[in-house]
Amino acid sequence: MNMRLTMKMTYLLGILAGTLLALPGAAPAQDLAKEALSGFPTQTIRLEFSTPAKLRGLPNYGTLRQRYIGPRLRKLVDELGQLGIREEDISGLVLGWQPGSAEMGLYGFATGRFSAQAITESAAQRNMTPTPVAGKPAYCLEAGLAGTCVVVLQDSLGAFGSLTTLTSMLEAREGQIPSLSSDSRFPSLVAGANKDAPIWGVAVGPAVADWFRGWMPNQGNLKLDWGKVFADVNSLTYSVAAGDDVTLGLKMDCKSAESAASLRQVLEGLKLVQQMAWDSQNPGKPNPYRTMDVGLESSQVSLKLTTGYSELELASGAAGMVN
């Protein structure tokens, strides 16, 4: 997922998690990371953490928010609004992906301010019948197994996802099935991530190629097999820091120094292609890809890209809106 889609999904799922929110006492970020490691199923191949309170303080956040709300997102926002959801109550989010899952098929945990009693009463007023999930009541916003449901776990903590995924999450959280903490890669990657950034995440296996597929959607006439390009990448760690500009930083651990050197060459080539595509689509505008830095150290490849908010909006317009 690229920076623009990351912000869009963080906003969307911030609203979704807001279903859970309304008493003080949010858990700190490290506790949310622990929840993800102990509560996500082992099929998870990517995690993304965000701090919506920081994101709401971004320059032009209101403009960004309005620009990236497509029809499908508006529909979900309307549904959640029926429960009296307030997006500003959210404090932290962690999202999970499984192989083959799409943007709207995400799941995760949310922290903030919430009242289970208020949600129960609001749901009852709208004749929303709770569905038991691992012994806890879940309120589903859409019909069917794939619809999004929410569960209040305790003060300031809730979970969301499909009924099937929620069941796995709660069972993992209770120790009934293995959780993501049993995969040694994820605790190590989370420990080494830049947790000060308002958005940061880790990915392994096919999730690495999927992340780049979204981040570099336009390669001009160059057609790439992303799966092959990142076949020798074991893991990805990324962060999005925001201030006067937006800075994307990432590190990829490769299987060998040789595979890392080859990957760096590919990324340098993509940098040139992206520069030309940008200049063609946005003549006379500052080109963020000219400042993209690709580094190499042993078997690790790093990348850093800084862009202004106006360039970020231009990139979003060129890529089109995701519904």
Feature locations, PLM:
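Bacterial N-terminal signal peptides that target proteins for export
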Residues: 2-14
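Bacterial N-terminal signal peptides
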Residues: 13-22
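Structural boundary/hinge residues at secondary-structure and domain interfaces
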Residues: 29-146, 187-228, 265-295, 300-302, ...
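Solvent-exposed, non-transmembrane alpha-helical starts
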Residues: 120, 168-170, 260-261
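A conserved glycine-rich beta-strand in the N-terminal activation segment of trypsin-fold
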Residues: 148-212
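Structural motif
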Residues: 153-154, 242, 297
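Hydrophobic lipid-interacting interfaces of membrane-associated proteins
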Residues: 162-164, 255-257, 299-301, 308
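A contiguous, surface-oriented mixed alpha/beta subdomain in the mid-to-C-terminal portion of proteins
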Residues: 206-264
